[in-house]
Amino acid sequence: MDYLYSALTSKMNWIALLLAGLTFCCKVSVHSCLDYDDSYDYYEEEKTETIDYKDPCKAAVFWGDIALDDEDLKMFHIDGTIDLKQQTHGRQGHTSGGLGEHVPTKKRGSLYLLLDRIRRLGFESWPVNSSKDVSSIKTGIRRVNSARNVKSRVPRAATSRAEKIWPGGVIPYVIGGNFTGSQRAMLKQAMRHWEKQTCVTFIEKTDEESYIVFTYRPCGCCSYVGRRGNGPQAISIGKNCDKFGIVVHELGHVIGFWHEHTRPDRDDHVTIIRDNIQPGQEYNFIKMEPGDVNSLGEPYDFDSIMHYARNTFSRGMFLDTILPSRDENGVRPAIGQRTRLSKGDISQAKKLYRCPACGETLQDSVGNFSSPGYPNGYPSYTHCVWRISVTPGEKIVLNFTTMDLYKSSLCWYDYIEVRDGYWRKAPLLGRFCGDKIPEVLVSTDSRMWIEFRSSSNWVGKGFAAVYEAICGGEISKDSGQIQSPNYPDDYRPSKECVWRITVSEGYSVGLSFQVFEIERHDSCAYDYLEVRDGLSENSPLIGRFCGYDKPEDIRSTSNNLWMKFVSDGTVNKAGFAANFFKEEDECLKPDNGGCEQRCVNTLGSFKCACDPGYELAPDKKSCEAACGGLLTKLNGTITTPGWPKEYPPNKNCVWQVVAPTQYRISMQFEAFELEGNEVCKYDYVEVRSGLSSDSKLHGKYCGTEVPEVITSQYNNMRIEFKSDNTVSKKGFKAHFFSDKDECSKDNGGCQHECINTIGSYVCQCRNGFILHENKHDCKEAECEHKIHSTTGTISSPNWPDKYPSRKECTWDITATPGHRVKISFNEFEIEQHQECAYDHLEAFDGDSDKTPILSRLCGNKIPEPLISTGNKMYLRFISDASVQRKGFQATHSTECGGRLKAEARQKNLYSHAQFGDNNYPGHTDCEWLIVAESGYGIELTFTTFEVEEEADCGYDYIELYDGYDTGAHKIGRFCGSGPREELYSAGDAVLIHFHSDDTISKKGFHIRYTSTKFQEALHTRK
């Protein structure tokens, strides 16, 4: 009995150690935890998601970023000794354990309550902060198992439970509605990365019962291991988890992988430094038993994307918890990379899903493949599978160029099967053998499956095939996807794709965009997507779209829709992704959709609405008296229901303010507090010019920032307030007042432009003119301009009309120190001359016409952009007495980087042009080369330094090199608060490289630099 008590005590100790993950699981940060909010608002998650999925954030236990449910706990024999259900004490985030994902100290939580409960059950022998070795804890487990005569079963490096494997390696998925276009593209890139390297296939969910849901959850980065079955399961890509490598890691769990460092042979390869582990996180470093783990014959993989980093769950950012052993060269391998799948990851996944020994996933738009050994014969008993996956909306054209297989009746022995889809159960396009080359095969969608088997000893050449993805074509089905060529990567140049979509008779075609990013142009002249209401290019035009704003949902009037995508040969963007489906107008039914007042048809559904002064009742069909109404006073006050107390949930208030003709209405908010942030997805107020819900939108507002004064374009204004069913705030109080628009009659008497103001108006002159003393007329202005703004437009005098004769204009443009001036011409038409001797525009590389000339321009051809070498540029336009033309219009902006000269006087360098006003932009790569005179070095002083922090400075950083290029001695890579002291070069040049990624941005940096006499060696001043 004493032995059993001891064994149970040991088991409970191990259970408590494992369950240290209860609300103790790590808070996530992408290379920095600075922006992770401990008081996470649950309602900032994806509220609109209606899928009842298996939520990893509600797991019984967490093991790092792995969610364990009751079924998983049985694997640990945690099955009834005590009630181990999770007790929530605050919301926690999780980390994938990758390189640079620092985890701060954890708060006390339910672990301590659990230990209390263990003690109350009579297990008093283990103190809370026990340093008992993990292996001894496991000894207790083995004793319990032995006593029960039950074979121990614990998680493996790759799951060994057949029900956790996705059948056929096919994983259906849904991407939740809260992700941006760039995040959606990144999620698809991560899935395509797994597809490219293995035989796992991700497909958009159709009618599958089990599938994964990408969602934004409060537990950060978190997932179950393998397939849960019996419905959807979530993979949480929460705050700061939207990095390619982190998503690849989390997908590794979905596919069926545990963490690499839990293997039984890990002590031969790494050392766990227990003293550096955060209290309560020891369970994350439990090692499995040799008899229980099957790593599928793969050696220990330091490079695995499933391996923890050296400092995961460390007490301090620079303290190791996992120390890799040195290799034969005495070097410790890097661990914890979150960049791509390792060779070991790929090999293990192929074994787990029993991928055929030959074949691959082909994702390029063109490609080729052939049988093993081609053209020298293929071996017997061979099995190969090729999966071709191109962009949805494209079709695959497969052409066999050679065919020499053993011929048999019904191609029974050696054969090739081609299927129209993503797997072996897709419709068969053909089964081939012998030496007759098949006809060209064309898929109906964007995937094709090619399987080759040989079972004879006959030796033939084999086969060879080429394929090509073609965009556009006839699409006759009720739902599907269309994406720009090469999505989620940038679309290809010089493409033209035409799709003709037909759905069932009696329906219209609905088109909804998830992602849209096409080269921007005012008239969409370069790259664009054109949509027409019919089947031909002569059908009525619905719209021609470009830029970065997603088009509104589109509905055709018939069961046909025509789409054309065009890209030119220059700028390429991310493109678009859209879903199409058959659409029915439920509002045309005799019962008006069951709505009491108004029925509003929406894509895929409908909704009821009410007349002004009414709102929907809880049944969402009938209407009842509401807030809002028609207001005809010249001034008044509007407040949310219940003001100044919190507004109620599920409210929809519409105020329609109408003023006399020639009046404009202004709205000024006195107080403002609504749920939400910049997204305004939950509670919000919309202000529009006009009375309808689709009139011009001035803004959609939420949060606590008081909006600026809003003035209508017409004599009416619509204000709509909506609240959802959860969080309520104080609301808003606003005053409206009407003002006569003097500009609406005779342009206010202004010669050029009339600008209406509250209570009055002002006249304004076009470019090249100034206002006359009478405040209405315009006269020709002096033409000297000093420009200090980071961006703007400049143009010739009198633009867009012809410039005057005998005119001289100058522009003295100054950019932020460390940034160069860039001039990009939008239009250009100046009198032509071979040497530009008459009318011309000159650009000088400095602050006057005494500096080096960059260019002298005339004619009708738009010049290439002009870029200064320093932070100043001087432009001079001169016209003579004869011919006048339209002139020019150009945009001035800034370019970072360049060559800078260090002198005795101190100079400045800023990280970005809008330093002090805005954080630095994303996707930045800038290089500055600072050069001193021969015999002098360079002193750098960082007066401000605030760059996204991360242990290895992997995301945003500044690199310094003691020389002219990156081959020189590297002084260091800095992020966070940067170097604390002055830096000196050992030579006469310093190269500065600044990089930022596409997520978190900070204030940036300000460097003062000067030349100084050489120091004996590179050093910092203490």
From Swiss-Prot:
Propeptide: 33-156
GO process annotations (BP): blood vessel development; determination of ventral identity; dorsal/ventral pattern formation; embryonic caudal fin morphogenesis; embryonic hemopoiesis; endothelial cell development; mesoderm formation; positive regulation of BMP signaling pathway
Gene3D superfamilies reported for this sequence: Collagenase (Catalytic Domain), Laminin, Spermadhesin, CUB domain
Residues engaged in binding Zn(2+): 249, 253, 259
Assigned GO CC terms: extracellular region; extracellular space
InterPro entries: BMP_1/tolloid-like, CUB_dom, EGF-like_Ca-bd_dom, EGF-like_dom, EGF-type_Asp/Asn_hydroxyl_site, EGF_Ca-bd_CS, MetalloPept_cat_dom_sf, Peptidase_M12A
Top EC class, one word: hydrolase
EGF-like domain span: 583-624, 739-779
Molecular-function annotations in GO: calcium ion binding; metalloendopeptidase activity; metallopeptidase activity; peptidase activity; zinc ion binding
Cofactor dependence: Zn(2+)
Tissue expr: During gastrulation, accumulates around the closing blastopore with greater expression ventrally. At the animal pole, expressed in the ectoderm flanking the anterior neural plate. At the 10-somite stage, expressed in the developing tailbud and cranial neural crest. At the 20-somite stage, also expressed in the hematopoietic system.
Enzyme active site: 250
Keyword set includes Glycoprotein: yes
Disulphides: 199-355, 219-241, 221-222, 358-384, 411-433, 471-497, 524-546, 587-599, 595-608, 610-623, 627-653, 680-702, 743-754, 750-763, 765-778, 783-809, 836-858, 896-926, 953-975
Entry's cofactor comment: Binds 1 zinc ion per subunit.
Residue ranges of every copy of the CUB domain listed in the record: 358-470, 471-583, 627-739, 783-895, 896-1012
UniProt signal peptide: 1-32
UniProt-annotated glycosylation sites, renumbered to this chain: 129, 178, 368, 399, 635
Keywords: Calcium, Developmental protein, Disulfide bond, EGF-like domain, Glycoprotein, Hydrolase, Metal-binding, Metalloprotease, Protease, Repeat, Signal, Zinc, Zymogen
Domain Peptidase M12A: 157-356
Enzyme Commission number(s) of this protein: 3.4.24.-
The keyword Kinase appears for this protein: no
Role description: Required for patterning ventral tissues of the tail. May increase bone morphogenetic protein (BMP) activity at the end of gastrulation by proteolytic cleavage of chordin and release of BMP from inactive complexes.
Protein's name according to its UniProt entry: Dorsal-ventral patterning tolloid-like protein 1
Organism of derivation: Danio rerio
